């Protein structure tokens, strides 16, 4: 198996893909491309793009959307969905709470979408805008029939609390959407996807590199240790939900109590709420005392201590002031540097270091996941550097 710069991979021979010559802003007539039981995937964002993850699927009898994000380039660009698409969609399936997957939900509802918005309870708690018609996934029943021709299974992705993948059966077709996917995370559980058969799989492939997560985690731990060995405090800006708990757990398991770990209130609250819940955290974590991670006022600093700040892009003036007023403070960025904060400028000026933490899949891991299943068509997403051959695929 080989994967090109941007790949659409078929694991066994099928009919050729039928690209659209039309712009994404219009709905294609069903009889133009669709034969009996054929469906189309419209990439409304998320492939060769900065965030804005959104996929529209339609067939003769059903249409739905998976994720509705805005761009992360500072422009808050909306998905490329026509008014007809928005009105026709019966369901919106949300994989997790991050803005690049949920930022356009309100826009869809304001422009004619009236169907249920499916998401996990944690995702619902985390998002700011609450959809008008929300259907919460039941964690005790990971299979759901929405009508006689549309049903789904779902599972945990390991990306953050509440993040899920979807395996959807509709009109005789089977579709898999990985969401932001991470097996073997240091904190979050993942329901590893194995042995599925699908006509279409849209899979996280955020990192173009060909290594795997364990190498990336080691690089982050090594960078942290190098910074701490000089007895300086270490600051790690992170999102409110996601990799913060994963990195904190790696540091605790690697360094023990040699370097005390402090957290912004929002992140420590996450730790207190889910750190001892077996649904979210790995078994070995459940017995750790809560005080292994300390509460932090986002002001005080001590040399040789680790500080997690819930401001991943350094958007807040208070965060930047903390860095500017403490030249001894080491700053380590570990995620994408977006356009709506100042994190990128701190990195480009040399004030912050950067080592990528693996909370998505590398291209190698995308290939691994595809090889562990029987996916006829694989469309990778979440990589701004890799553009698809077309915005529309028939399967």
Residues covered by each model-derived region:
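Glycine-rich phosphate-binding "P-loop"
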Residues: 203-218, 282, 347-360
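Pre-active-site segment of Zn-dependent metallo-hydrolases
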Residues: 35, 47-94, 98-99, 103-115, ...
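Hard-cation-handling environments
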Residues: 223-332, 381
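Catalytic core of the metallo-beta-lactamase
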Residues: 56-59, 143-200
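Short, Lys/Arg-enriched N-terminal segments with co-localized hydrophobic residues
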Residues: 19-38
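C-terminal regulatory/interaction regions
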Residues: 291-395
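Active-site neighborhood of phospho(di)ester-bond hydrolases with catalytic His/Asp-centered motifs
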Residues: 66-68, 89-100, 105, 117-120, ...
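Metallo-beta-lactamase
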Residues: 121-163, 169-171, 276-304
